[in-house]
Amino acid sequence: MTLPAAPANRLAAAAEAIRYHYDVGNEFYSLWLDRSLTYSCAMPDGPGDTLEAAQDRKLKYHLAAIEADRAGSVLDIGCGWGSLVRQLALGLRVPRCVGLTLSDEQAAYVRSRRYPGVEVRTENYLSYEPDAPFDGIVSIGAFEHFARPDDTRDTKVAVYRQFFDRCRGWLTDGGALSLQTIAYANMSRDDASEFMRTEVFPDADLPTLAEITAAADRIFEIKTVRNDRLDYAWTCEQWARRLREQREAAGQLAGAETVARYERYLRLSALGFRMGKLCLLRLVMRPYQGGYFGGTRAADGTRAGADGAGPRGAQAASR
C-alpha cells in the first residue's frame, strides 16, 4: 500500500486549505448560516422545516449516536464554530469536551464563548495527543479534507486508516464514533469540477463509501450507514437563498468576487446532491472488542488473548 505523504507536508497543506475557506470571516458566515453557525449538512424534517431546527436535529442525532447523555468526555474533530460542543457543555453538561479545528477564526470564536469544560485546539488530529480517552468522538465535515487530489486510492485508504486507528486509540472500549462526510457517488474524482477543487476546497479530495469501509476494516464495526444526499441539497439551497438575501452586506465584508464564488459553489453543490453525483454519508461506528475480528489479526497486527482482552482495549483502559 502506498504510504501517505510526509506528515509535515500534509499538515501544512491541510491547514492552508482550511484557512482559505473558513477564515473568510465570522461575520460573513453569520449572514447566511443559522444562529448556531453550523456549517454542515442539516437534517430537515420536510421541505417546510427551518434551517435552525434542521441543524439542531442533526446535532442531536450525532449526540444520540455516541450516547453523549451518558458520556464523561467527548472529542469533536472539526468543531467549526462550536455548535456541537455548546450542546455538550450547556445542554448535556458533559464535563470534558475537546474541539479540534484548523481555523484560527473558528477557534477564537469558540474560546470567546467560554463554555464550561470545553477546550478548543487549533490542531490537526494527526498531531493531537490526548491525556485521557474519550467516551465518544464526533467528526462532521472534516473527513472530506483528509485526502489530496493527487493521492492514489491506496494512499487515500491509508490516510483514512490513520484517522480510524487514532480514533480507536482515543476511545474507551464502550465508546462510539459518529462520522459525517460528503463522498463521491455517481461521479468519479476526474469528473469533479475544477472550480470546486481550486476555488472552494483546494488540496482536498472526497472519499467513497468503499474507501471508508476498507479503511475502517478490523478497527471499527460499522453499525449504521445513511446516505442523506437530499438533506444536503436542501441545506445548500437554504444557504444559497440566505446569502442572496444578504448579498450586499456580504459583499461589504468579503468582496463581491468572494460572494459570487460562494453562491456558485452552493448552487453546484445542491445540484450535485440532487443528481446523485455526491452523497452525504452518516456512519455510526463502534470499536471491535477483543482486539480481532473474524479470526483475523487486529489492526495493529496482534491477536487477542483467550480472555478477550485485546491490546487496544488494554491501551485505552490505561490512558
Language-model-detected regions and their locations in the chain:
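A short glycine-rich, Lys/Arg-flanked "PGG" loop and its adjoining helix->strand segment in the class I
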Residues: D154-D173
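Conserved SAM-binding loop of SAM-dependent methyltransferases across substrates and taxa
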Residues: W81-R93
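Conserved beta-strand signature within the Rossmann-like core of class I S-adenosyl-L-methionine
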Residues: G174-T181
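Substrate-binding/catalytic lobe of Class I Rossmann-like enzymes that use SAM or dcSAM, i.e.
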Residues: I182-R282, R286-F293
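N-terminal auxiliary segments of SAM/dcSAM-dependent transferases
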Residues: M1-L31
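Conserved class I S-adenosyl-L-methionine
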Residues: R70-G78
